[in-house]
Amino acid sequence: MTIDGDVHEISPFFQVRQTKWGGRACFSNGNIPKGTTVLQVSNFTGTSISYEFRKEVCHNCFAYANAKTMKYKLNYDYLRDLVCNAHYQINPKKFLGAGLWFCSEHCRTSYLQIPNIIELIECYEILLHHFPSMLKRYNYTSEQEEKLNSILISENVIQSSWDEIESKWIPRINNMKSAKRINQLPPTCEDEYCCIRFVCESLFNLKYMDPQCITYRAFNMLQSNELSKISKFPVLLHFQKLVFQTLYILLPSHLHRMLSIPLLRHILGTEYGNAFGLWQEGEASDSREYFGYWVFPEASYFNHSCNPNITKYRKGNSMLFTMNRDIKKDEQICIDYSGVLDLPTVKRRAFLADSWFFDCACERCKSELQSVH
């Protein structure tokens, strides 16, 4: 049976169903020939370009400049028509470019034509303005990180930590004047900066997304891997709180209204295990650059197989999922999560367990394990 009407309409080629062995999977609606693109998605909830690539990757089409800085930035002149008479926290004389770079005039123009994009640009600009001082104060030692990673994580530990933010930290911040709030910004490194931008974009996209659209409904139903991920890396709980605190202090009112602890936890919890890598196009898998990640809720219902019948690839700012062989009706449609299919069975399964929190039981793994024993 299908699990829910909310994700039944993802593709005419397959249905998302509850499996006999637990969990969800995609099953073909009919015979599908090799070469058929069963899903093409461009409605991501959020993207994150790694800090080291922020100037070398186009923020619209994700083209890569081969270690060269993109030629097209934003200056305030491009925003005049977007700002109009509305009150945005963008200083014409001190505009930094919002941390956005583009490969062409076309991509810059396309990005600026996104409805209400000035709101996201404002958030990026505010963050970029404060980031240098936050980074300057970032001095976590390996001993401090080791201490944070030594915490024994449970659902209660995570919940208690957020309860303290809600009951103590938020009321204290709310009672401060704006200038004093800024002094409460936590020290932040490059990884947190990129994650904050990812959450900003996710909040922005969710704000203007039709709640009845398939992307929104699929996002709400995504499985959170919060407990599994933080249990493995307890420092992430501290990381998440820094992200929330920064957003709570800096976000302008139009996106601040979207921010809540449950939504932030769902955004980050579903990113763990559901994000797709942003990879360089047109290069062999062993030589292409990894730029960051993005989340496509509709594409997150494919299960993994070490012998996948789908090949996934990026085309500009879209992801395509194409059959690499013929399949029959009711056959499960699977992708490769790992990119390590050439590894020996034991190492491959260990990598999947560490990275995606499941013990692979695909037909290839079962067959190879039987031959070993």
Curated annotation (Swiss-Prot):
Keywords: Methyltransferase, S-adenosyl-L-methionine, Transferase. Its EC number is 2.1.1.-. Residues 12-338 form the SET domain. It comes from the Eukaryota. Pfam families: SET (PF00856). InterPro entries: H3K4_H4K5_MeTrfase, SET_dom, SET_dom_sf. GO terms for cellular component: nucleus. PANTHER family: HISTONE-LYSINE N-METHYLTRANSFERASE SMYD, POTENTIAL PROTEIN LYSINE METHYLTRANSFERASE SET6. Belongs to the class V-like SAM-binding methyltransferase superfamily. Involved in resistance to compounds that target ergosterol biosynthesis, including fenpropimorph, dyclonine, and alverine citrate. Since a deletion in the absence of these compounds does not have an effect on growth, is more likely to be involved in compound availability. This is Potential protein lysine methyltransferase SET6. It comes from Saccharomyces cerevisiae (strain ATCC 204508 / S288c). The lineage of its organism: Eukaryota, Fungi, Dikarya, Ascomycota, Saccharomycotina. The gene is SET6.
